[in-house]
């Protein structure tokens, strides 16, 4: 069983992860060093000895390391013991608690990798991933409209979007959204949302929202 959270953006080839899993046939998870103890509080923390995970703590208040699970898992058939896990009155809501339980039951292997990883489940990290992907460039869809406007670095304008008389930087403008007479930076403007005569910085504007 292969499980990958949809808010992951990582740089490794998934076939490498699967090959690593097959070499052990034990539960395996991808592990990344976030390099920051405060960030580590938001993830499952891993303690590794050799080629085995010896401790797993789901979102600890006081992390001792920065190596975390990124919610990319592979399980052999004999490790899919959900009925047994739930029968023990364990937490049913987050997979990290199941991993913590598995570590107590037997061998769980890490697949440690370098390079990029972004948890794009928040607006800030999503924009960080966009910045990495665009690398200072802009992408404007062929049927988007940009008139009398200045686009700074890392702007992605999707089909049907309209930008007029505005300055936009480090922002994603989704389908059929519009920005008029505004300065918008570090923001996500969702589908069919509109900004008129208002300046935004660090905003997440939901679908069909209006700011004016």
Residue ranges, per PLM feature:
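Catalytic-core segments of class I nucleotidyltransferases/pyrophosphorylases
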Residues: 2, 18-22, 52-119, 123-133
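Fold-independent oxyanion-binding glycine-rich loops
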Residues: 5-6, 12, 31-33, 50, ...
């Amino acid at each position: 069983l292969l499980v990958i959270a949809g808010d992951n953006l990582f740089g490794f080839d998934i076939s490498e992860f699967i090959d690593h899993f097959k070499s052990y046939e034990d539960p395996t998870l991808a592990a990344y060093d976030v390099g920051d103890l405060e960030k580590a509080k938001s993830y499952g923390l891993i303690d590794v000895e050799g080629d085995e995970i010896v401790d797993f703590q789901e979102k600890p208040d006081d992390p001792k390391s920065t190596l975390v699970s990124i919610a990319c898992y592979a399980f052999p058939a004999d490790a899919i013991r959900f009925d047994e896990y739930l029968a023990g009155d364990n937490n049913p809501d987050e997979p990290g608690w199941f991993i913590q339980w598995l570590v107590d039951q037997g061998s769980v292997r890490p697949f440690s990798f370098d390079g990029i990883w972004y948890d794009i489940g928040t607006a800030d990290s999503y924009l960080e991933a966009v910045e990495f992907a665009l690398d200072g460039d802009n992408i404007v869809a062929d049927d988007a409209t940009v008139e009398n406007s200045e686009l700074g670095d890392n702007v992605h304008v999707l089909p049907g979007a309209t930008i007029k008389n505005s300055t936009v930087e480090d922002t994603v403008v989704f389908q059929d959204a519009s920005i008029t007479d505004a300065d918008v930076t570090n923001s996500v403007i969702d589908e069919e949302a509109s900004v008129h005569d208002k300046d935004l910085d660090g905003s997440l504007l939901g679908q069909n929202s209006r700011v004016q």
